[in-house]
């Protein structure tokens, strides 16, 4: 068989990757090389994390049969991580759901019944009855949706329109609340706009990398490979890694720092103090582009109001702040001396000084990276604000090789959850439901009556659990997420509400997850390239893909489910008379007609698709649904610093980083010469703020919501491992990944194990104040906790570690702290 150079590279990429991963090379190589001409290739972003790697997807006879890194993708440059190479297999698990399943007994729905196959019409019949009953009896606040940072952009947009405009309920929130909400609030407080100002191109231009609570070696391995290349090829590049336990990223670290949980706040303030004391402030930048404010303190822990910690808080949930002088700020951080910081954190003084010197050195270009260690934190917003302080004091921001960078964990936590605005308080392009002007903009664009979108913030993720338990939220639809496994405090706050006979729970998913099996109705869902989609990654890169195969059986995309279900409701059934009177022409119309089959959305014909191009939703409806929704959504950000390119441009490109102005993407925001919104002569402009200045916040250390004591004497931290993604609902169906890490283990220091008469491989009961799980003792391996802390991944459905965790949240972002609670161990 004769191959072009390009085809030869494609074919061999899989073989090379398989060899690097230690897989059986001949079979993989033959599958690609031997059948090259028979396989159809097309591009897509990876289905997993927020890095946004580009892959080439090979299809044959209606199935995805191969996958390789896309050599033209600027993010990963042809390389995949181990999960990326097995993308085809996530779609073909033996237990893939192919038809709706309803709990039934004696031929009808029963909360205690067995899951029984039904048709889509029957599923929508039951859903329609439950939604209409709840809306009639209790109103819009009795229904809710929990969505996903894995939704495509138009799925999230369609869901937000259906709930906020159609059902008039802001009780829609994404699972990104559990991972990125603190980053969002941190960005908004400091800069007035969400998402990083830099991009991945910084990696090759930086002199120093500082990881705050980020194990990039396992969670963002492709970016880590680029950092590793930079570090090993340049002796002047430095890597510092901070964590509460030792992990694989420490292998590259020049300065590996293990600190006491929660004390990262102390370290951040110490570095600010060091910068000031050593006259390392960039005075020109600081004087022109920065304001100083002192934030409210003693703000509580996002627990129920009846909890003692909430009762004791002086300013529960307060986001207030007041202006302060530089002298006052200097005095504030002066308290965080080297001696005090070393004592509070357990970090040796020399390591602290080395870290501070990186930021203080005017000749060092520094990037700060962080993920869940910062965000899943009862003071996660503060941690985000405090790291911005370091970059604003030194002016190391919005320039190549310099800047703070919040990494995302889901493929479209940025593009869908944040940019589209699927949070309970947000609207597209950083607008919010509490702002009348913002609501008015959306209502006019959507051609719905003024006053349709509620001004009240809806229920966030943890509040949804509590409302279900309390019987206030009665119909609940979750999509593309597995919150029964991933959310905190399963026993006390989630399971009771899901199984409450007053409530009806719908789960849309490709597989029978823990969440699906706890639901009342399961809807089978199309996944990844079984639909046309778009994701937005951590560097503001929006990427599109085409539908490449059809979903099995009766599985349907989340977009199809939302749009088709909207046909079941007429405006009179969901809107009060005073709204209908404002737009009488909408009487008698379905929500489908009002929200989706509008002149604005339906104006792009199906004929724009290639004749052989799959697009199940658009061909069924008779118009190019995805293009119509995207162009309507993109209107909100254009001209406002969130500019997205025209729809068709994304199918041609390997992603574009917004703002995209006059066909050109933006690598670095807020700086002259890089950002089209910064005029000549302005230098820097943080245009999310009215005065164009960013904010440095004075924020102190405050303790964790729960710490070890005499009985529960260990910290528990939870997280992920390289081989599995989140709850493992996809990766555990890949035999190779499952074999590589078949079950969760409890990583523990050997001396802590010895003190409890535990040995490696022993079964151990892990107990918190909320529940218990049985796990396996691991005293070796990739994760090495210090004495006093244990670490456990949450991918294993047989070991629900979130039975143990506390539902404490950051009071500002409402994001859960999965990194800190107290446990004890009992030998089994």
Swiss-Prot record:
Annotated compartments: Periplasm
GO biological process: cellular respiration; Mo-molybdopterin cofactor biosynthetic process; nitrate assimilation
Pfam family, one: Molydop_binding
GO MF term set: 4 iron, 4 sulfur cluster binding; electron transfer activity; iron ion binding; molybdenum ion binding; molybdopterin cofactor binding; nitrate reductase (cytochrome) activity
Domain 4Fe-4S Mo/W bis-MGD-type: 39-95
Highest taxon above the source species: Bacteria
Residues given in the record as substrate binding sites: 794
Annotated cofactor note: Binds 1 [4Fe-4S] cluster.
HAMAP family assigned to the protein according to its UniProt record, in alphabetical order: Nitrate_reduct_NapA
Name recorded for this polypeptide: Periplasmic nitrate reductase
Organism this protein belongs to: Shigella flexneri
């Amino acid at each position: 068989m004769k191959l072009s150079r390009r085809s030869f590279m494609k074919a061999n990429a899989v073989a090379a990757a398989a060899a690097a991963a230690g897989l059986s090379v001949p079979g993989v190589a033959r599958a690609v090389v031997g059948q090259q001409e028979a396989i159809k290739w097309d591009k897509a972003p990876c289905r997993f994390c927020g890095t946004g790697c580009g892959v080439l997807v090979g299809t044959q006879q209606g199935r995805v049969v191969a996958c390789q890194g896309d050599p033209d993708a600027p993010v990963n440059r042809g390389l995949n991580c181990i999960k990326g190479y097995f993308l085809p297999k996530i779609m073909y698990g033996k237990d893939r759901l192919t038809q709706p399943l309803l709990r039934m007994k004696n031929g009808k729905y029963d909360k205690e019944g067995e899951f029984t196959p039904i048709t889509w019409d029957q599923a929508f019949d039951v859903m329609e009855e439950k939604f209409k009953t709840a809306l009639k009896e209790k109103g819009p606040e009795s229904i809710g949706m929990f969505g996903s940072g894995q939704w495509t952009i138009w799925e999230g947009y369609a869901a937000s329109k259906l709930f906020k405009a159609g059902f008039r309920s802001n009780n829609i929130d994404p699972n990104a609340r559990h991972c990125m909400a603190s980053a969002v609030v941190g960005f908004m407080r400091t800069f007035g706009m969400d998402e990083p100002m830099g991009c991945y191109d910084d990696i090759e231009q930086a002199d120093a990398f500082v990881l705050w609570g980020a194990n990039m070696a396992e969670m963002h391995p492709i970016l880590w490979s680029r950092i590793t290349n930079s570090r090993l090829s340049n002796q002047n590049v430095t890597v510092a890694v901070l964590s509460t336990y030792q992990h694989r990223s420490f292998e590259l670290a020049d300065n590996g720092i293990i600190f006491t949980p929660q004390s990262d706040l102390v370290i951040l303030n110490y570095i600010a103090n060091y910068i000031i004391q050593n006259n390392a402030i960039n005075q020109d930048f600081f004087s022109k582009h920065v304001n100083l404010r002192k934030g409210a303190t003693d703000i509580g822990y996002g627990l129920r109001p009846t909890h003692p910690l909430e009762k004791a808080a002086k300013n529960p949930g307060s986001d207030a702040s007041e202006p302060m002088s530089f002298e006052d700020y200097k005095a504030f951080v002066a308290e965080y001396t080297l001696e005090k910081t070393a004592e509070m954190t357990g970090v040796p003084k020399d390591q602290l000084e080395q870290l501070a010197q990186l930021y203080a050195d005017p000749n060092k270009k520094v990037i700060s990276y962080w993920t869940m260690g910062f965000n899943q934190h009862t003071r996660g917003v503060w941690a985000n604000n405090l790291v911005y302080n370091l970059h604003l004091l030194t002016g190391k921001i919005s320039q190549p090789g310099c800047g703070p960078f919040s990494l995302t964990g889901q493929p479209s936590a940025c593009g869908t959850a944040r940019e589209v605005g699927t949070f309970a308080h947000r609207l597209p392009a950083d607008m919010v439901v509490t702002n009348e002007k913002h609501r008015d903009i959306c209502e006019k664009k959507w051609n719905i009556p003024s006053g349709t979108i509620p001004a009240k913030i809806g229920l966030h993720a943890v509040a949804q659990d509590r409302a279900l338990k309390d019987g206030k939220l009665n119909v609940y639809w979750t999509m593309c997420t597995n919150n029964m496994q991933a959310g905190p405090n399963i026993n006390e706050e989630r399971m009771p509400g899901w199984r409450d006979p007053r409530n009806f729970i719908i789960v849309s998913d490709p597989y029978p997850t823990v969440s699906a099996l706890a639901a009342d109705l399961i809807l089978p869902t199309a996944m990844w390239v079984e639909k046309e989609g778009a994701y937005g990654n951590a560097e503001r890169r929006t990427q599109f893909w085409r539908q490449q195969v059809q979903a099995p059986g009766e599985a349907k995309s989340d977009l199809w489910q939302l749009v088709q279900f909207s046909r079941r409701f007429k405006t009179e059934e969901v809107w009060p008379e005073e709204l209908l009177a404002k737009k009488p022409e909408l009487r008698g119309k379905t929500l489908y007609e009002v929200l989706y089959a509008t002149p604005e959305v339906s104006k792009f014909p199906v004929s724009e698709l290639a004749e052989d191009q799959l697009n199940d939703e658009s061909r069924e409806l008779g118009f190019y649904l995805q293009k119509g929704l995207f162009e309507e959504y993109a209107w909100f950000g254009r001209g406002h610093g969130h500019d997205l390119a025209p729809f068709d441009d994304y199918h041609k490109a390997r992603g574009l980083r917004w703002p995209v102005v006059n066909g050109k993407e933006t690598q670095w925001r807020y700086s002259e010469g890089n950002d089209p919104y910064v005029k000549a002569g302005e230098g820097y402009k943080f245009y999310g703020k009215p005065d164009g200045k960013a904010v440095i916040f004075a924020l102190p250390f405050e303790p964790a919501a729960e710490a070890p004591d005499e009985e529960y004497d260990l910290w528990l931290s939870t997280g992920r491992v390289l081989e599995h993604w989140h709850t493992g609902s996809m990766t555990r169906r890949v035999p190779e990944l499952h074999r590589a890490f078949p079950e969760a283990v409890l990583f523990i220091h050997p001396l802590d194990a010895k003190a409890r008469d535990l040995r490696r491989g022993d079964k151990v009961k892990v107990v918190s104040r909320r529940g218990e799980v049985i796990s396996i003792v691991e005293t070796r391996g990739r994760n090495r906790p210090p004495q006093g802390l244990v670490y456990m991944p949450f991918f294993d459905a047989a070991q629900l570690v979130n039975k143990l965790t506390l539902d404490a949240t950051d009071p500002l972002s409402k994001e859960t702290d999965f990194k800190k609670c107290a446990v004890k161990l009992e030998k089994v």
